[in-house]
Every structure is written in structure tokens, then in C-alpha cells.
Amino acid sequence: MIYEKLKKNFSLLFCLGIIFLSSFFASIIQTSFGSVDVELKELKTDDGQTLVYDLYKPKLANSSDKVPFVVVVPGFQRSKEALSNIAIELSRRGFAIALIDPYAQGMSSSSTSRLAATTQGYGMFALVDYVHEGNFAFVDINKIGSTGHSMGGNAAIRGADYFGKEAIRSSTKSKLDSVFVSGYVLTLRDNILKDSKSNMGISYALYDEGAFRNELKGWDAANMEIAPESLRAVNNALPKENQIDRVELGKYYGSKEEKNLRVVFNEKLLHPFQPYNKEATANQINYFEKVFGFP
């Protein structure tokens, strides 16, 4: 009787087994074989909005052994799961990570602003403020960063500007020590870059299909060696006598201590493949090792 029932429902049981095994192995990978705790959290912001995020906390991090903190911001119409690979790679190297659902995406609330990236960083600004106030005892508040792809990259640029202006007004260090901008260069403009007090890494796909919006046109639209956007980002950090007319890809310009370190990458990829490519991911990991060091 039991054998007949098992035989009759074999396909169902097989599928359920695959689901459970896949979930188990996915959990093992997400937690870096149990070395990282992953928790779904929610932040109620002062303006009545709700930001939902996954917190990746290395188990070795505590109030005595504080670690850097990086906010990961997905792009337009993407929920937090779209960049879970970046959160996993950074957390397994000892960083605490907040992988957010941007405002109006995933489980986060809608935004009260029509300019959610510019004025709120899709929720990243509020989270940086919250963490900088010392609400996570295991975080080194002098090593807070952000990374994002596409519109999430724009949020990172806007964060450097927003917290840079705040630092200038209060004559303090920027709360946002370092940012990494992936797949977005449209807002690398002088009026936005001039107040940045954050180190900045930039990664842009050479074959990005959105490059037609950039300042250069034709085949050179995405060439970050000569693009006005990348040249501005680098020259903004250099004295006038040392400014350049061609960017050396992968070279670090400026000073980490002065919070004007700059580096530009130009991987031979299409826009949507950038966050999942081995070379582009390695460039981002190496950047955060450079600015923060691995705990």
C-alpha cells in the first residue's frame, strides 16, 4: 500500500526533494557556510517611509571587533535579490552589508519624493544616518560605504554629494566614506562632484546599451578612458597642475586619506551582465579592500 502511494506520487516527492535540497544549499551559500547571519530588517524613517533590507552580519563582528558597513542599492525596478551576489561576496570577506529594497520596489514603501535617488538615495541616506548614529554596535562608523548598479549607482553618486554637502556645512568628515558606482555615469557632473567628500570607484560596461545618453556619441560613447564623465570624476580629485586628459583604467588617483581616491574600470560587457561578471565583481571587491581593508 505504502509502496503504491510512493510510486504514484514519485514525481511530486522528487520535485519537493529538489526544492528542499536547493533551498538548503542556497542557504549555505548565502550565509557563507554559516559564518554570516542574514536577517530581514525594517527601518521606519523620519518622513514616514519604510525601508526593508537584508542585514548580512559576519558572526565575528561585535562591539570589540567592529567591521566596515556597506549599503547595496539595486537599480530601477529591481528588488534586493537582484544584487544578493554582491552582498554575499562582500559579507564573506568580513563586511557588514545592508542589501536594500529601494523605495517603491520590493517590500519597501513608496517614496514621498519624485526625486527618490537625488534626495533620498532610494532609502540609502536614511540607513546611513541610522547606522552612523551607532545603532549597530558591531559597525565601524568611520567606514561606511555604498555601492549600486545602474540607478543604484546614481544613488551612490548622489550620496557622495548629499553627505559631502552635509560635511561641509558641519565641518566634519562625511558619513559616507566611500562609494562604488556601477553602470551609471550620467550624474558625474561638476556641480555634483565638487562637494563630494567620499572615495569613489566607477565601473562602466564598454558595451553598455544605454551609452547613447552619454556625452560622447558613436563608438566612443562608453569609452571611459576619454569620456568627459570619467575625466571629471578623476580631475575633480586632482590639483589643477596634475589633471589628466586620458584616464588610465584601473589606476588609483587621489588619496584615500583625503577622501578623494578615484579609480575607473571599463569592462567589456553589456549593462545587465555587469553585476554578475567575474571581472567586474573582482574590481568592486578589490576597491573595497583598498578603501576599507578586509577585517
Residue ranges and their predicted role:
Residues 3-44, 52-54:
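An N-terminal hydrophobic leader/cap segment in hydrolases
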Residues 30-294:
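Soluble extramembrane regions of membrane proteins in the secretory/endomembrane system
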